[in-house]
Amino acid sequence: MATLTIDEIVDAISGMTVLEVAELVKKLEEKFGVSAAAMVAASPAAGGAAASPAAEEKTEFDVILQDAGANKLNVIKVVRELTGLGLKEAKDLVDGAPKPIKQGVSKEEAENIKKKLEEAGAKVEVK
């Protein structure tokens, strides 16, 4: 079996779509019997009081599709436009709501994305 370096693995992951990375995380969780959510939840406890000021100065936001609403086709079109995903990937993302559409974006970009998705009939949350 070929041995991959950490840099090769990072390069491979950086070329993946959001859906592919989410699938990778899910498979790693299953294989190793762990949960990525548990790790994230444990991190703020270690930070204690230092985590509070950081929350006030948040500069990166995640746009979460909560529900596609009644006009799912228009929502899929907007998701494709915003993410560059193919039709099947965009449909899977919309069908799997709640799911992140974009992560680590500026507040202005997050609000623009939210506006476009809500105009298409979706329910969206910015975190």
From Swiss-Prot:
It comes from the Bacteria. Keywords: Ribonucleoprotein, Ribosomal protein. One of its GO terms (cellular component) is cytosolic large ribosomal subunit. It holds the Pfam family Ribosomal_L12. GO terms for biological process: translation. One of its GO terms (molecular function) is mRNA binding. SUPFAM superfamilies: ClpS-like, Ribosomal protein L7/12, oligomerisation (N-terminal) domain. Transmembrane segments: none annotated. InterPro entries: Ribosomal_bL12, Ribosomal_bL12_C, Ribosomal_bL12_C/ClpS-like, Ribosomal_bL12_oligo, Ribosomal_bL12_oligo_N_sf. Belongs to the bacterial ribosomal protein bL12 family. Homodimer. Part of the ribosomal stalk of the 50S ribosomal subunit. Forms a multimeric L10(L12)X complex, where L10 forms an elongated spine to which 2 to 4 L12 dimers bind in a sequential fashion. Binds GTP-bound translation factors. Forms part of the ribosomal stalk which helps the ribosome interact with GTP-bound translation factors. Is thus essential for accurate translation. This is Large ribosomal subunit protein bL12. It comes from Hydrogenobaculum sp. (strain Y04AAS1). The gene is rplL.
